[in-house]
């Protein structure tokens, strides 16, 4: 009997466990798209509309059937993307590292590959969040001139409060997360209205916690990641945009709540396969794989500020 790919795959349990616990503090996409696992690649995502906010008849007469209500609806199929790279450890490097206590070159190589895959996940999450076509006209604003938060005459707080009210009227909850492009974070730290607000505190700098207090949201995170294109051009992953959203709390992410987005990840991933020796290059190789897709499932729960920088 032939084996399928899942049965044939031999995992390195220690490195796989390490991979599943791997995090990179520089990446913030999970703040908008928390990870939920999928048992299979063939599944459809649950999307959210305004049906959960419609007034329903709940009163029941004796002997009458009980009304039923289903939240959300089965939406588009989730197309998981497989990201795969091999961590290569030349035996010469391994021999040299063996003379130094505490150095595990195999794990170092896996960490390097995991960082590359995590960057790809961050880029995909940012692309989904920054796609203006995914938002209703009421839930986005392309800023220009004195509206830009980098302009000293702008009023970011008023704009955020207006956006919070848009989201509240769409989903009945106030947003709890604000993601800022890295350059935008720096600009807000110098904005005259914000520095004047915190001047009595004698703070040396405007922190993210202070911005969260200023905008009255639970969490403000700064998307500082960059990457280089093939031509050498450096790209700011989150650009000069800001995304305000309501994201389901950690204990409620399996429930049909109108959360902004999720990263659907195949169960058992990421994984690291057992090392194999490649005689042609005299190196050990560990294949690292992950399968995921960042999905905007509740655009009503978000607001996109385009070109705020």
Regions found by a protein language model. Give the residues of each.
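Sequence/fold signature of self-assembling virion shell proteins
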Residues: 2-60, 74-83, 146-155, 195-309
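General structural signal for secondary-structure boundaries
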Residues: 88-94, 181, 203, 207, ...
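Alpha-helical scaffold segments that mediate packing/assembly in large oligomeric complexes
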Residues: 91-174, 182-195, 308
């Amino acid at each position: 009997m032939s084996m399928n790919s899942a049965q044939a795959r031999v995992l390195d349990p220690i490195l796989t466990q390490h991979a599943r616990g791997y995090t990179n503090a520089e990446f913030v996409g999970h703040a908008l798209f928390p990870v939920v696992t999928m048992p299979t690649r063939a599944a459809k995502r649950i999307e959210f509309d305004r049906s959960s906010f419609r007034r329903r008849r709940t009163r029941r007469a004796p002997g009458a059937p009980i009304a039923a209500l289903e939240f959300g609806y089965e939406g588009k199929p989730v197309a998981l993307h497989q990201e795969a790279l091999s961590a290569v450890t030349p035996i010469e490097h391994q021999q040299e590292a063996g003379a130094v206590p505490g150095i595990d070159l195999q794990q170092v190589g896996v960490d390097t590959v995991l960082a590359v895959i995590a960057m790809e996940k961050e880029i995909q999450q940012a692309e989904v969040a920054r796609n203006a076509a995914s938002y209703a006209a009421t839930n986005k604003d392309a800023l220009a001139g004195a509206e830009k938060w980098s302009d000293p005459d702008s009023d970011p707080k008023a704009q955020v409060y207006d956006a919070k009210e848009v989201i509240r009227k769409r989903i009945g909850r106030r947003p709890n997360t604000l993601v800022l492009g890295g350059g935008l974070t720096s600009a807000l730290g110098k904005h005259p209205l914000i520095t004047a607000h915190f001047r009595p505190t004698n703070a040396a700098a405007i922190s993210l916690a202070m911005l969260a207090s200023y905008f009255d949201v639970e969490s403000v995170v700064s998307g500082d990641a960059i990457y280089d294109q093939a031509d050498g051009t450096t790209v700011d992953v989150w650009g000069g945009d800001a995304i305000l959203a309501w994201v389901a709390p950690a204990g409620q992410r399996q429930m049909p709540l109108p959360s902004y987005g999720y990263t659907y990840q195949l169960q058992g991933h990421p994984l690291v396969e057992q090392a194999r020796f490649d005689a042609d290059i005299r190196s050990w190789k560990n294949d690292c794989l992950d399968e995921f897709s960042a999905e905007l499932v509740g655009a009503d729960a978000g607001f996109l500020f385009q070109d705020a920088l």
